[in-house]
Amino acid sequence: MFMTQIVFGIAPTLLKTFSHLTALDLWRPSAPYVFDPVTSSTYLGTIADGVEEFLGIFYGQDTGGSNRFAPPKPYIPSRHSFINASTAGAACPQPYVPLPADPYTVLTNVSEDCLSLRIARPENTKSTAKLPVMVWLYGGGASVGTAYDVSYNPVGLIQQSVVNGSPVIYVAINYRVNLFGHAFSDALLKSKSTNLAMQDQRLGIEWIKNHISAFGGDPDNITLFGEDEGATYIALHILSNHEVPFHRAILQSGAAITHHDVNGNRSARNFAAVAARCNCLSDGDRQVDSQDTVDCLRRVPMEDLVNATFEVAHSVDPVNGFRAFMPAVDGYMIPDEPSNLLSRGQVPANISILAGWTRDESSMSVPTSIRTAADAASFISTQFPLLNASTIHHFLTSLYPESDFTTNSPSSPEKVTPAWRATSALHRDLTLTCPTIFQAWSLRLSSNCTTPVYLYELRQSPFATALNNSGVGYLGIVHFSDVPYVFNELERTYYITDPEENKLAQRMSASWTAFASGAFPLCERSERSLGRWEEAYGGDRVCRDRMPEHVRVKGIGDNGDQDDGDEIGKLMARCGFINRLEY
């Protein structure tokens, strides 16, 4: 969408820049535009509901061909370009139906030319505004996902930030996932071509720091926020060998030690399996760790490689194909096991943290066929093979006794047992809650206890009615329940009109943007936000090496946003034991 006086005479080499040009685009005086003095380029976007959006802005070059399984290269537009930023960018390689359990979500544009940004800002934002910048990293088990997913529509978030008096700019980074973002072999290690998802994200953040001021953002006030694997990526960036290029972090259902298989074995094993399926291991002298294997896989057509990748992924996780390929220690992006880095205090200071989880994070990951303690022990031993039988017995008899868990569900309570509920809670704490608490304390300790840390537990779900109507209300406050609230898009995206649900979305969205703006926790405006929110370890006057026995976790939702002292006390006792284990 460009000015007519410069359209004529454009060289064919600028086709990528002008790829969506139409005659009507040339005469859209209402379209917002941004001039970037760094590249002397102009971006033409869209506007709706008081929010301006700029879509499909490339920060990296095409990752196909010789750039497959290689570090991202910056994309630099030709000077004086007029760039159409009104169309969503392509999703990075993944199935057109990313999740078999969700056949209604179908991607129509999948390409290796996918390293792009989605930027949104309040209407009429000036380049001099210096608004806080919130950068979103999506989840999806390190396997699927895109910045343009309808669940991440930023309009409601931006609108609420304006209403709340803390306007922000939103940026979502598109990056490689699955094998394309987490291939792992000796040859790739030697060329520093591992953890490419994180390298993509890093390049995207560098673009933001260099160019966001043209959009009215403050490059010195960046908050990263993400959910699931997105939160894990953020936590790993904090522990990376590189300078941390952001100032605050919001970790929703993810931590650096959420995964306990980060030595690269899983990704390497599955990389070899994909290579075999693609006939890239057929020669006797062609070993999986050789450069020949990488070169062979670079020649495989994208769709064939995606198919082979997810055949292997679904052999690891038959339901979703998650985490067959995942972040791994490489000495470059991830210098060591995250638990070791946190224990040694090798973490940067002055990164403010807001982190939390949903009450029933693991309910959809634990089979309802668990009826007894023996069933529970068998499941836990399979999921966590490094835990011995005596430790599992201690968990199930002392720390997670069935007497602590009831089946008080309004929907078919007979479908689950106390043993299932205990197992769900234990799985949640092993994979997420206790690692989050340990990481939060380690980050606070690294700053000599001067950096604020806030924790929360979500106790309400926008999906409750749908779950009850489907007969699975016992699943409770499921994973991903926080995302619709944070983006404040219940009505537009999920057709949820309940006033109380939408009120919580407005308040939660307001608190997230307030945190990013530095106005957190907005005690004086509790009706517009979640109100008073005490620091997790705010009562400790002395900075101790040992984690305190008590922590403040804000309950969000049905309890009127109050802490539940008894439950948090039990949680800390359980985490005190879990965080001493190696598993």
UniProtKB/Swiss-Prot annotation:
Disruption phenotype: Alters the ratio of the 2 atropisomers of viriditoxin by favoring the production of the P form instead of the M form. This is Inactive carboxylesterase-like protein VdtD. Keywords: Glycoprotein, Signal. One of its GO terms (biological process) is (M)-viriditoxin biosynthetic process. Pfam families: COesterase (PF00135). Belongs to the type-B carboxylesterase/lipase family. Transmembrane segments: none annotated. Residues 1-23 form the signal peptide. InterPro entries: AB_hydrolase_fold, CarbesteraseB, Type-B_Carboxylest/Lipase. The lineage of its organism: Eukaryota, Fungi, Dikarya, Ascomycota, Pezizomycotina. Inactive carboxylesterase-like protein; part of the gene cluster that mediates the biosynthesis of viriditoxin, one of the 'classical' secondary metabolites produced by fungi and that has antibacterial activity. The first step is performed by the polyketide synthase VdtA which condenses one acetyl-CoA and 6 malonyl-CoA units to form the heptaketide monomer backbone of viriditoxin. The product of VdtA is then O-methylated on C7 by the O-methyltransferase VdtC. The O-methyl group is important for the stereoselective coupling of the monomers at the final step of viriditoxin biosynthesis. Pathway: Secondary metabolite biosynthesis. Glycans are attached at residues 84, 109, 221, 265, 307, 350, 388, 448, 468.
